[in-house]
């Protein structure tokens, strides 16, 4: 058996997407494994964002799996890692972990992790071999929305200021770099080196959705961001708005600003005719997790975040961040 690991190529993308769906759908026990992920797409957007961070594995010249690195400045994670079911339990996955570790090192990532199935000892054991350790559960949460705001949202809206938000797609091109600097300043204040500029630009250039920029009531200071995918061919899929990352600056108004941000996301979703919001909440970020429950989000499924060196990173009880590292 001849194993070859290399960078993923554009002409691999269809096969890589097929293997990803088949792998995850088979593991989850679906009658039709290829229906997993619906019409969402993880492979193409992540490859387009950074081809140097997309990896392929071949056996005897045939593509059998892929893996991706995502870097947010000093923070990085990898996945989804997929191997064709024919090659499960043959020690193949480890060949796709080594190159991502090398990539994380080259990018000088200080805080690295991944998301995996909490119920699978096999997955957890594999990653522990490389010094990734399970910490808190991450809940993938959803909220169904309607044209008329439900009573709970109205109640919350009355308690908190109305959003003062701008969407990145509405900003003039000549000032976008300044806005990106503000975003970097905000996230760096939450965790040193955390930088979502690449993610914001990927969403903008690939037309995957939009980024909400939440300002204080004066409209002068950025207090939060929410990077959202929506629609077919994105990581969300049809009729879904997926909050891939959101963060609120740390201050006395963090909790109320978090609710304002959720209001802004919901308003955008309603405007786009979208009926569901999906977002990940690490349970170590207790106040954010609790706020999402109070807002009407419910857990759809749970995984576990595994952290290199067992670092806590930005997962503290009082940190208002949304992400899931899938």
Question: Where does each model-flagged region fall?
Answer:
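GNAT/GCN5-related N-acetyltransferase fold signature
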Residues: 57, 69, 83, 214, ...
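Conserved active-site alpha-helix within GNAT-family acetyltransferase domains
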Residues: 90, 94-95, 106-111, 118-137, ...
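Amide-forming acyltransferase catalytic core, primarily the GNAT-like/NAT-type
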Residues: 129-242
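Active-site rim helix/loop that mediates acceptor-substrate recognition in acyltransferases
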Residues: 13, 17-68, 191-212
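Conserved acetyl-CoA-binding loop-helix of GNAT-fold acetyltransferases
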Residues: 80-83, 89-106, 111, 128-129, ...
């Amino acid at each position: 058996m001849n194993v070859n690991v290399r960078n993923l190529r554009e002409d691999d993308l269809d096969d890589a997407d097929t293997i990803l769906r088949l792998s995850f759908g088979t593991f989850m026990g679906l009658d039709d494994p290829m229906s997993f992920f619906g019409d969402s797409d993880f492979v193409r957007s992540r490859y387009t964002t950074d081809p140097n961070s997309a990896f392929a594995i071949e056996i005897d010249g045939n593509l059998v799996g892929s893996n991706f690195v995502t870097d947010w400045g000093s923070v990085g994670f990898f996945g989804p890692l997929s191997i064709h079911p024919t090659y499960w339990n043959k020690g193949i996955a480890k060949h796709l972990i080594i190159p991502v570790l090398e990539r994380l090192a080259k990018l000088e990532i200080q805080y690295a992790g991944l998301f995996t199935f909490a119920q699978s000892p096999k997955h957890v054991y594999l990653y522990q071999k490389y010094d990734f350790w399970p910490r808190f559960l991450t809940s993938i949460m959803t909220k169904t929305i309607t044209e008329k705001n439900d009573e709970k949202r109205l109640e919350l809206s009355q308690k908190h200021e109305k959003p003062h938000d701008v969407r990145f797609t509405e900003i003039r091109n000549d000032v976008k770099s300044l806005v990106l600097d503000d975003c970097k300043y905000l996230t760096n204040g939450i965790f040193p080196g955390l930088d979502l500029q690449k993610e914001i630009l990927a969403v903008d250039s690939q037309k995957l959705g939009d980024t909400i920029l939440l300002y204080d009531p004066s409209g002068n200071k950025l207090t939060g961001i929410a990077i959202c995918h929506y629609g077919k061919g994105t990581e969300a899929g049809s009729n879904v708005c997926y909050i891939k990352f959101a963060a609120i600056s740390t201050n006395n108004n963090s909790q109320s600003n978090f609710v304002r941000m959720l209001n802004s996301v919901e308003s955008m979703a309603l405007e786009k005719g979208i009926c569901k919001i999906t977002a990940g909440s690490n349970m170590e970020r207790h106040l954010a997790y609790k706020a999402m429950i109070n807002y009407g989000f419910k857990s759809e499924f749970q995984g576990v975040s595994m952290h290199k060196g067992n670092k806590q990173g930005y997962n503290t009880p009082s940190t208002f961040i949304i992400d899931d590292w899938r």
